[in-house]
């Protein structure tokens, strides 16, 4: 039996993970990026950019449920949602499940990524691009939040790691723009990497966000594809109460929403804000 081809992730120099490649569906390598989508028997379709896994069919639901339902149910009455990035459509898919949301704006810098993901990752968007509440804006995320006249109740930054094109979505200019177009009491969330291996990224986000929001913290979820520990999500708002809502309040909102999830539930929501001591200590050591 012929040995299967392997794809190795290159995010870290000293260690990593690999996937067996059953079938390469797409591979484009240019001076600017290396994009590949392949099939793996354990994880389904896998998309990687510049040597780093971005999403897989098998476990994407964990990431996307936690990035949408945590802020939306904590807010309680969000009407207008902004997604920065998210061209694969899975974040949009989860937001559309909230029937009280009236408008969903997605800002994607690459016009081709939506059609590309429609073709190669159809299970991610599950038809959500056709939702009448959805509007796609082709623009740089930093430019959009600093120029738009729209305001939002929840902003979800579905950014890549802070290298290359994704670096601008971890800057003070971006965070300031997000604060500018958030409605009072609005919530901003963003992926912040695997904290055990990328702690400096979390601390940097904490410092910068604290200049613009009165309540800044993190919540976490275990996502197998993002190896090295627990995935960390930044949380920022000026409504200090929203991070500390009781499980009973979240439970009532969850039941009223009619959501049926595979990972998220009200107990997970509450528990996600319990941070490991090493991260608590690192955040506590930052100047106020």
From Swiss-Prot:
Residues 9-238 form the PABS domain. One of its GO terms (cellular component) is cytosol. Spermidine binds at residues 64, 88, 158-161. It holds the Pfam family Spermine_synt_N. GO terms for biological process: spermidine biosynthetic process. InterPro entries: PABS, PABS_CS, SAM-dependent_MTases_sf, Spermi_synthase, Spermidine_synt_N, Spermidine_synt_N_sf. Coiled coil: none annotated. It catalyses: S-adenosyl 3-(methylsulfanyl)propylamine + putrescine = S-methyl-5'-thioadenosine + spermidine + H(+). Pathway: Amine and polyamine biosynthesis; spermidine biosynthesis; spermidine from putrescine: step 1/1. CDD domains: AdoMet_MTases. Its EC number is 2.5.1.16. It is found in: Cytoplasm. S-methyl-5'-thioadenosine binds at residues 33, 108, 140-141, 165. Keywords: Cytoplasm, Polyamine biosynthesis, Spermidine biosynthesis, Transferase. Disulfide bonds: none annotated. GO terms for molecular function: spermidine synthase activity. The active site is at residue 158. Catalyzes the irreversible transfer of a propylamine group from the amino donor S-adenosylmethioninamine (decarboxy-AdoMet) to putrescine (1,4-diaminobutane) to yield spermidine. HAMAP family: Spermidine_synth. Belongs to the spermidine/spermine synthase family. Homodimer or homotetramer. This is Polyamine aminopropyltransferase. It comes from Shigella sonnei (strain Ss046). The gene is speE.
């Amino acid at each position: 039996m012929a040995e299967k081809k392997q794809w190795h992730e290159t995010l870290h120099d000293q260690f990593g993970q690999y996937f067996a490649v059953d079938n390469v569906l797409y591979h484009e390598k240019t001076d600017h990026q290396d994009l590949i989508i392949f099939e793996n028997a354990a994880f389904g379709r896998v998309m990687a950019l510049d040597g780093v896994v971005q999403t897989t069919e098998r476990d994407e639901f964990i990431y996307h449920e936690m990035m949408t339902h945590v802020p939306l149910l904590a807010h309680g009455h969000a009407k207008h949602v902004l997604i920065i990035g998210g061209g694969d459509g899975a974040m949009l898919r989860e937001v559309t499940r909230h029937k009280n949301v009236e408008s969903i704006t997605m800002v994607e810098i690459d016009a081709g990524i939506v059609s590309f993901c429609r073709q190669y990752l159809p299970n991610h968007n599950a038809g959500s691009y056709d939702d009448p509440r959805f509007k796609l804006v082709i623009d740089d995320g930093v430019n959009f939040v600093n120029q738009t006249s729209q305001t939002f109740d929840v902003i979800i930054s579905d950014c890549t790691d802070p290298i290359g094109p994704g670096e601008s979505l971890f800057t003070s200019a971006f965070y300031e723009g997000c604060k500018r177009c958030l409605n009072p009491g609005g919530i901003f969330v963003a992926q912040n990497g695997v904290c055990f291996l990328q702690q400096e990224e979390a601390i940097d986000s904490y410092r910068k966000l604290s200049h613009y929001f009165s309540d800044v913290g993190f919540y976490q979820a275990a996502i197998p594809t993002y190896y090295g520990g627990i995935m960390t999500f930044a949380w920022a708002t000026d409504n200090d109460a929203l991070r500390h809502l009781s499980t009973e309040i979240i439970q009532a909102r969850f039941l009223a929403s009619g959501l049926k999830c595979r990972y998220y539930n009200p107990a997970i929501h509450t528990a996600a804000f319990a941070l490991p001591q090493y991260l608590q200590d690192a955040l506590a050591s930052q100047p106020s």
